[in-house]
């Protein structure tokens, strides 16, 4: 079904069954598969391929040669009808690739809202991306990676499969990330190592001084106290009673499976 207000270039191929929403613009030489839904106000600029069971929300901007919902690169994949779900107001730049999920990984690759995926970024099967993240040019996420909200991944960085990156993390360019990264941390290197709290980013997002102070103290407990993570958890729990932002650390540690960067 194609909404009457949608504008589709005659060179594009829209397979029967695709659902194209109000005021969608599809430029030249795009291909949209039969199980694709595209929400109101989204633009496919040109040469965009959207396949598989894929849902794209409203007001997204998708640039040339992006490939969304294509067959993933997991050798166990046998053509199951897994999904790709993309939220609203994302900017997906040239040559970005986003692969559909796998049955073993939950069946869905998911992108939230208001993200910027720069040129040549790759998001593999079953990744879960939050809101307002930035992946710089050539950043690559292996399968099952999770990014919290407001994560910045520097250009030419690679994140190992199953890694969890906490909210408000900033990863410097050219990093190789093979273990989980706690919230609010800045890290860089091969392999990535922590080098402080993302204070400037947190200030821009309205974190007040008491909250920043608490986050700094928790960072020092984790990385500078000489104690094990198990030993500092009770102290972090005490901070979380008065500073809700600190609870992100506790949620993160409960979910972490690969150990944290050191």
Swiss-Prot record:
GO cellular component: cytoplasm; membrane
Function description: Involved in the biosynthesis of lipid A, a phosphorylated glycolipid that anchors the lipopolysaccharide to the outer membrane of the cell.
Name of a matching Pfam family: Hexapep
Subunit structure as annotated in this protein's UniProt entry: Homotrimer.
PROSITE patterns: HEXAPEP_TRANSFERASES
EC class name: transferase
Keyword Ubl conjugation: no
Entries under PANTHER family matching the protein: ACYL-[ACYL-CARRIER-PROTEIN]--UDP-N-ACETYLGLUCOSAMINE O-ACYLTRANSFERASE (PTHR43480), ACYL-[ACYL-CARRIER-PROTEIN]--UDP-N-ACETYLGLUCOSAMINE O-ACYLTRANSFERASE, MITOCHONDRIAL-RELATED (PTHR43480:SF1)
GO BP: lipid A biosynthetic process
Record-stated family: Belongs to the transferase hexapeptide repeat family. LpxA subfamily.
Species for this entry: Histophilus somni (strain 129Pt) (Haemophilus somnus)
Record EC number: 2.3.1.129
Database matches in InterPro entries: Acetyltransf_C, Acetyltransf_C_sf, Hexapep, Hexapep_transf_CS, Lipid_A_LpxA, Trimer_LpxA-like_sf
Protein known as: Acyl-[acyl-carrier-protein]--UDP-N-acetylglucosamine O-acyltransferase
UniProt-annotated location(s): Cytoplasm
């Amino acid at each position: 079904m194609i909404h009457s207000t949608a504008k589709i270039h005659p060179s594009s191929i829209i397979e029967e069954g695709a659902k194209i929403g109000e005021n969608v613009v599809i430029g030249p030489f795009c291909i949209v598969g039969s199980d694709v839904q595209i929400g109101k106000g989204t633009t496919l600029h040109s040469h965009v391929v959207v396949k598989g069971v894929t849902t794209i929300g409203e007001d997204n901007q998708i640039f040339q040669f992006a490939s969304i919902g294509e067959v993933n690169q997991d050798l166990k994949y046998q053509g199951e009808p897994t999904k790709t779900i993309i939220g609203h107001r994302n900017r997906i730049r040239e040559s970005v690739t986003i692969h559909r999920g796998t049955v073993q990984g939950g069946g869905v690759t998911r992108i939230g809202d208001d993200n910027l995926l720069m040129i040549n970024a790759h998001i593999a099967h079953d990744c879960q991306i939050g809101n307002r993240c930035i992946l710089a040019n050539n950043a690559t996420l292996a399968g099952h990676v999770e990014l919290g909200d407001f994560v910045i991944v520097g250009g030419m960085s690679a994140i190992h499969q199953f890694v969890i990156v906490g909210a408000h993390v900033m990863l410097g360019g050219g990093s190789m990330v093979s273990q989980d990264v706690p919230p609010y941390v800045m890290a860089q290197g091969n392999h990535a190592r922590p080098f402080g709290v993302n204070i400037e980013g947190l200030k821009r997002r309205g974190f007040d001084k008491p909250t920043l102070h608490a986050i700094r103290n928790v960072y020092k407990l984790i990385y500078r106290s000489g104690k094990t993570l198990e030993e500092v958890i009770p102290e972090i729990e005490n901070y979380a009673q008065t500073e809700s932002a600190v609870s992100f650390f506790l949620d993160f540690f409960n979910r972490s499976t690969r150990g944290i960067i050191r």
